[in-house]
Structures are given as structure tokens and as C-alpha cells.
Amino acid sequence: MFFIEILGKVKHKDNVANFCENVLLDLMPKNRKEVDVVVKFVTQCDDQESGYCYGDQEEIIISIAKKSLGEAYSFEEQMIALCHELVHAKQIITGELDGNYWKGEPITSRSVLTSPWELEAFSLEKTLFEKFYKVSFDSAILFS
């Protein structure tokens, strides 16, 4: 069971929370743990990243940037970044990614972008976005 809180200035907070829940349930259909998920929409993330995720199996904190290097992200780009970070949330909640360990093996120094946890997140972000964006936002956007 996921308890989702959306913080920061973002339109359609209830829809964003529903979107998060749908993505997480798709990634972890058998999850029975109670997990608090806090999603913060911030002006920008450290190192100009589009998003960041950290936490443990009981609480996940996700930051989503509204801009990077002075350029604003579209709402859709923010939701794709959110999908990417929700994959990392799944990895943390299930114990696949745990501090300096990936699936129980120590993480050696390697390029983060080619790490298995990033490759999984990049491979799923657009699929998850396409699967849940219209369902979660079409009516909200039409009537805003």
C-alpha cells in the first residue's frame, strides 16, 4: 500500500498522486508493504538532474526538477522524469538497490548511466508514461 504526498507547485496534484500510484502498482503488483512516497516538485535538482530518488523500504523521497540550466521542463517531461524515479523507488522498496549494493552485490565504481539500475529506469520510463499519462491526466487537462 502506497501513501503518496505531492509537494511543491504543480498542477493537478491529485492526478499526479494517482499517476504515481498506478505506476508503482504496475511495477510492484504484489506489494503489501506500507510505503510513504513523497514527491517534491522543485525549481531544480542538484547537478542539473531532472529528478532524484532516495529512501528506504518504508519511505521514499523523490525530487522532480521544473527546470535545468535555465530551461523549463514541460509537464510531460516532468512526468517522464517521475516515471524514471519511480522505477528507482521500486528498486529501493524491493531491496534491489540498497545503499552501495545492487541485488546483493557491492556496487563497483562504474559510470552511473550504464549501471543496471539506470538502464532499467531508462528502459521503462517512456513505457510507463505512455501507459498511465492519458488515463491520469486527460480529463484534468481538458477542464483546466
Spans of features found by a protein language model:
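Surface-exposed helix-capping loop/turn segments at secondary-structure junctions
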Residues: 2, 27-35, 95-98, 132-139
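Auxiliary, metal-adjacent structural segments of Zn-dependent hydrolase domains
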Residues: 2-57, 127
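Active-site oxyanion-binding pockets that recognize sulfate/phosphate
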Residues: 6-10, 72, 76, 111
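Short, histidine-centered active-site or binding-site loop motifs used for metal coordination
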Residues: 8, 64-68, 106
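Active-site scaffold of zinc-dependent metalloenzymes
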Residues: 42-76, 92-93
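Post-HEXXH active-site segment of zinc metalloproteases
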Residues: 76-80, 92-119, 123
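Short active-site segment of divalent metal-dependent hydrolases/proteases
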Residues: 83-91
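Long, well-structured alpha-helical subdomains associated
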Residues: 111-114, 118-119, 125-144
